[in-house]
Amino acid sequence: MVGEEETKKRVVTESLGWLTESSIMPKKHRAIEGVGPSSIMELKAQLYKSQEEAKQTKDFTGSDAQYHRAKERIAAKDSFAAKNSGVESRNLKDKLEHKAVKDGAVSYAALEKKAQLYDKLARGELSDEEGEEKYCVDFFRKGIQHEDPKPSSTYNSSISAPPEDFKQDGEDDGSLFSTKFAGLGHAIGTADVGQHVRMVREVHEEVNQAREKATELKQRRQEQATNRREKLKQAYLRKQLEKLKAQQQQQEDEQKT
């Protein structure tokens, strides 16, 4: 009887979960490489720990669980950490621009660009097309369309009357100059639009003359450069011709000797 009990115990310990009612005989225990009794105990301990945690989460229900979740949600939210995209890059760009303006780099670059433009105008290297691209304002048209001159301009009381060319039929001197006496020897008047247009035309003509002079100077320099290149080319061809003649003469002398 004692031997049968020991045999039953041994079969139960070696079955490792197989059904005892099965007709299949239990296999012998196989040793797994790298797995020992200590590692099996660690796995069982980890399994027991996970089961206990699952039980605690199931038991932890009601208002306490809701309070715990709400508390974690509030702690995780940080309103100051959220930023729009591109804020840091814009701040850095603004700081660099402010520093450049404060140091005077922007003003220096503008003055340097203006000086280069003036040098080109003085040398006549600025073409008409480039000038039109640089200056996008038509000053002549702007002066003609200007119909609201500034009302306050002080003149001397001994101002002369406007010429007869600017008068129309039925107009007198007072229609072209609106004069108001402000005191002894002083008067406040407004110049007519025709005089303003005439001044703008004079400035426009001066600008055109200066532009024509610059164009002529540029053409003259281009012609001089072309003539210089042509002279150099002729001199180079002459030298090459002299070299060829010298080589032919040398070959003829060698053949004779």
Curated annotation (Swiss-Prot):
Keywords: Coiled coil, Phosphoprotein. The keyword Cytoplasm does not apply. The keyword Coiled coil applies. It comes from the Eukaryota. Residues 146-174, 210-231 are annotated as: Disordered. GO terms for cellular component: nucleus. Residues 196-257 form a coiled coil. The modification Phosphoserine is found at S127. This is Uncharacterized protein At4g18257. Residues 151-160 have a biased composition (Polar residues).
